[in-house]
Regions:
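Anionic, Ser/Thr-rich low-complexity intrinsically disordered regions
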Residues: 24-27, 43-50, 82-83, 87-94
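Short alpha-helical hairpin
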Residues: 19-24, 111
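Short, contiguous alpha-helical
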Residues: 2-17, 26-75, 117-171
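Acidic catalytic patch
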Residues: 105-118
Length: 171
């Protein structure tokens, strides 16, 4: 679990970093559904990382300050599609939440009761972490596909797979 979470964090930084180097209109690119632009997808990757972390936290022991902090943090991620200058903030949010997800992976696997799609369920910590990785991966691919559909072809996802992570980072 540790390697794949480290890879996710690295790939998030690399791919979104590459997106930030493109012309501003790249954030408006979409593949099929115009509601899912690259900008919206990038924002969604960042806000979802917060939500997965939120699902793992023991909120019963939160102080009033911690509750306010997390309320604000979760609201920040639900705003409109970012502009190019906002991608730095998205990268910072991801850097923080991805690091905290990695810390969560070092805890023993445990049952975590949560509401999901309007019903109460009990998920394993490892299930939530696995979904966080899967979710980020599928949306990075969605963003790059949307870019390619609109002629922005400079990002090759093969450059950011686990093989490339090991070669570049050495883990």
């Amino acid at each position: 679990m540790e390697k794949i979470l480290k890879h996710m964090a690295w790939a998030n930084q690399q791919v979104i970093g590459k997106i930030s180097e493109l012309p501003a209109e790249a954030l408006d690119a979409y593949a099929v559904n115009p509601e899912w632009t690259v900008g919206t997808i990038v924002r969604h990757i960042g806000s979802a990382s917060n939500w997965y972390l939120w699902r793992l936290l023991d909120r019963e022991s939160f102080s009033a300050e911690e509750n306010l902090y997390w309320e604000k943090r979760r609201e920040d991620g639900d705003e409109e599609s970012p502009k190019m200058q906002d991608l730095k903030y998205v990268l910072e949010v991801l850097r923080d939440s991805d690091a905290q997800l990695l810390e969560q992976s070092r805890k023993p696997d445990a049952d975590i009761p949560r509401e999901f799609r309007g019903e109460q369920h009990v998920f394993k910590r490892s299930t939530i972490l696995s979904q966080a990785v899967h979710h980020a991966t599928e949306h990075r691919a969605q963003a790059v596909s949307a870019l390619e559909a609109r002629g922005f072809t400079s990002i090759n996802l093969d450059d950011f797979d686990v093989w490339s992570y090991q070669i570049r980072v050495g883990e």
